Amino acid sequence: KLRRKITHTFFIHKTFGNYFSKSVHMHHLTSYFRRKIVPLGETYNTYINMKQTINERIQALRLILKSKSISAFIIPSTDPHLSEYVAPHWKIREWISGFTGSAGTVVILDDKAGLWTDSRYFLQAAQQLEGTDITLYKEMLPETPTITDFLCQNIKPGETIGIDGKMFSVEQVEQMRRKLEAENIHLEICGDLSGEIWKERPGMPNTPAFIYELKYAGKSCQEKIEAIRTKLKMQGTDGLFLSSLDEIAWTLNLRGS
């Protein structure tokens, strides 16, 4: 009853030393806190603890990197199919950084860390990274170095940068390797190091795939495969390799949940 009767309220929100005062309608409170990435009802101490947890995860990964003589580790948002929207099992970048946007890459060094993301997420990333050891790098701005340029500036010749090769295309790896080797920096495919510290990681999706009905798909998978073969023949190509989940699902009329 009290919530329904109140039309305005004045409140002070403290976030890492900054104070925000705002006079708002009561029904705007939830959206305000959502923009601040602090759910309504969550305490300030819980918010602080979340940031501390992110920093602890980063430090744990740094210890693994040090044990393997790796000076930096690159964590993209993708899964092994290079999807932008991934299953919880593959949300490694989100887990290590606290940033929940669909696109972004985290780079962890011994003394610094950064997140690169595009303009869709500049505001969200700034809010979610606040209080962590991670610096936001806004992609495509003149003053923002690319990840490779950043690494060349911060990694010494002879040192090694690690990646999980499953999460990158061959082209991406080749481009990075060319630039890094020009600076005598090594690129090593060393597996999923983050998984070694993510103790409560969700399991791999195991729900069954199902056939998408022809009345919705429009064409059978046989028709689609024959159309692809016709295109390949026209271009003098022997075969086509598909790894993207949406392309596989479309071609074979498969869906999942």
Q: What is each model feature region?
A:
Residues 2-3, 16, 33-34, 56, ...:
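Short, intrinsically disordered low-complexity segments
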